[in-house]
Structures are given as C-alpha cells and as structure tokens.
Amino acid sequence: MTNIRKTHPLLKIINSSFIDLPTPSNLSSWWNFGSLLGVCLAVQILTGLFLAMHYTSDTTTAFNSVAHICRDVNYGWMLRYLHANGASMFFICLYMHVGRGLYYGSYMYSETWNIGIILLFMVMATAFMGYVLPWGQMSFWGATVITNLLSAIPYIGTDLVQWIWGGFSVDKATLTRFFAFHFLFPFIVSALVMVHLLFLHETGSNNPTGIPSDSDMIPFHPYYTIKDILGMLIMLTALSALVLFFPDLLGDPDNYMPANPLNTPPHIKPEWYFLFAYAILRSIPNKLGGVLALVLSILVLAIIPMLHTSKQRSMMFRPLSQCLFWLLVSVLLTLTWIGGQPVEYPYVTIGQVASILYFLILLIFMPLVGMVENYLLKW
C-alpha cells in the first residue's frame, strides 16, 4: 500500500515541499535562514494576535493599553517584548537571508528573488506601522517624519500625505488605519511566502558552489529538518535571552513617553533595522532625491541579476568578489551606525561617502570585478 503522505491531496503537497523534497547535499548553515524566517513570522503572528486582543487603536487610550498589557495581562509583558524583539530577530534573519542570496548567486532564480524583494518591502512596511502603534513620542514623530516624505512626490505629494493621514496631521484616523494594516499585512506576507516557496521548488535550491547539484541530491527529511530544528533552537534561545534579560536593549527610551505633538524629540530615528536606509535618506540634502535614494537602496536588489557578469554563479571561488561583498557589509554597518547619530560633522560626511560606496559597489564594482575575474581565469 502506498504511504498516505504520497496520496492524500493535502499531505502530498506538504510531502513534496518538506519531506521527500530533493535537496543538494552540501547546503551550509546559511541555508537555515529561510526556515528561521518562517518561525519568526509564526511567532510574530501569534504574539501579535494575543496583543491585538488587549490593544486599543485610539489616540487617547493606545499608550495606556500597552501599559495595561505589560502590567495587568497574564504574561502580557512577555508577549509585548517577544513581539518587539521578535521583529529584530526577523530583520536579522532577513538581512542574513538576502546576504546569502547575494553571496551565492541565488538571485539567478529571478522569480524567487523578485518575490523576495516584494516580501522585504512588505515586512518593512509592516514593521514601520507596528512601531507607530504604542503611540509613544518616537512612534508619533517617526510616523510624522516618514509619511511626510511622500510630500516630496511632485504634484500629488501633499494630497497623498493627507490621504494617508486621514486629516491634516498624524492623528486618530492615522493610528486606526495603521493598526488595521499592521494586522492585515502579515497574512498577505504569509501568502507571498507560499508563492516564494512555489517558485523556489520549481527550480530547486541553489548550493554553496553554484554548480548544478542534480546528480547529488538527498531527501529534505531527516537531514535538513534536524538541521533546521537546531537553527530554530539557537534563534529561540537568543530571542528568549533578549526578551528575558535585555527587553529594552534595542528600543528607544523616548517611546516610554506618551505622544506629544507639541514637543519634538531631539533625535528622531527609526528602529535599528531601518537605520541604514535612514542614513541614505539623510545623506542627500534634497527631499525628493533623499526619498528616491531611500527606495532605491532596497529596489537596487531587483537589478542585481541583470548585472551578473561572472561565468561562475557563486562567490565561493571568487576572492576578489568576496572582498567587495564584505566591504559592502561593512558599508551597511557604517550606515546603520550613522543613521543613529545626530546630523552634524563628521557624521554627515561619513554617511554621504558610505551611501555613494553602497551604490557604487552594487551597481559598478561588482559587475566590473566579475569581468576581471573572468579575464584572470581566461574565460
């Protein structure tokens, strides 16, 4: 008799995706981040669901409802900090996942890559709207500053901003709609994740060498299920340590003050995972130019497959490209640091140099070095 997991209409989809899936035999730990992102999404949806049961999306009660969750709800503090720090873990895994794709040439699966970029934008939008919900000082002013950027769009900008606000300033209507969208988006993200996996399973996984692995495949279960479970345990241990010992490490103290439209905080800055993009935005002294640079800092990933000049897919055997890749990582870390600093000399200059370097490396240096490596290998 054939196993039920291979015949049942629903089980056979799960079977072909997570059990009998033929997988390259040499995947490193960098391939763990996909499953870790799935765990992060599940944690965020579950904690978010329980938080939404106690949260009120009204300007007069939002801040107090979060305080009520932390003080009066059973394990409410834990739910709140799991959700807030879970977002940080989500972005750590996201950036590692994208970095893996860049390093090993996974972007050559263009459908999977493009859905991934849409997912990145969606998760960033969700996180931004979630940061507004506690209605602290940084929530309010972050919402005001970031939504105001849309006013840089010629002709329709001002109308667009007022349409998003639901009035002439960030107020009750804004908070209510942000809560509605923040609740909705993770479910759209879940659907897109399915599409992401669908496209991935059309081609099969890439591997560290970048060489087709059709001749050497192993079943996903038990080899990679056990490997993924180890990764999950490590990540959940790190998240638990963060939540239980340093819950406010990555947050902003200003957000413990209720939103006050009459008092601007001295330094308005987003959560740490947006600081690199914020630094790029601030490094251009023109409003529209800054907004374009901000969007392009992520959208640039979409043209990476077109700029692939090397005859080899992965960077595993390309030391010059490896140097450039790690330079890019250091530039991004520099931008993250600059994004959290005040707008004054020398931070402004460092931010401008790092922003220019970021785009130069991705758009010009990497394709050039790929061609140089081809020449050196007489290809």
Swiss-Prot record:
The cytochrome bc1 complex contains 11 subunits: 3 respiratory subunits (MT-CYB, CYC1 and UQCRFS1), 2 core proteins (UQCRC1 and UQCRC2) and 6 low-molecular weight proteins (UQCRH/QCR6, UQCRB/QCR7, UQCRQ/QCR8, UQCR10/QCR9, UQCR11/QCR10 and a cleavage product of UQCRFS1). This cytochrome bc1 complex then forms a dimer. This is Cytochrome b. Its cofactor is heme b. The keyword Transmembrane applies. The keyword Membrane applies. Component of the ubiquinol-cytochrome c reductase complex (complex III or cytochrome b-c1 complex) that is part of the mitochondrial respiratory chain. The b-c1 complex mediates electron transfer from ubiquinol to cytochrome c. Contributes to the generation of a proton gradient across the mitochondrial membrane that is then used for ATP synthesis. Pfam families: Cytochrom_B_C, Cytochrome_B. The gene is MT-CYB. It is found in: Mitochondrion inner membrane. Binds 2 heme b groups non-covalently. PANTHER family: CYTOCHROME B (PTHR19271:SF16). It comes from the Eukaryota. A ubiquinone binds at residue 201. Keywords: Electron transport, Heme, Iron, Membrane, Metal-binding, Mitochondrion, Mitochondrion inner membrane, Respiratory chain, Transmembrane, Transmembrane helix, Transport, Ubiquinone. Its main location: mitochondrion. Heme b b566 binds at residues 97, 196. It is a multi-pass membrane protein. GO terms for cellular component: mitochondrial inner membrane; respiratory chain complex III. GO terms for molecular function: metal ion binding; ubiquinol-cytochrome-c reductase activity.
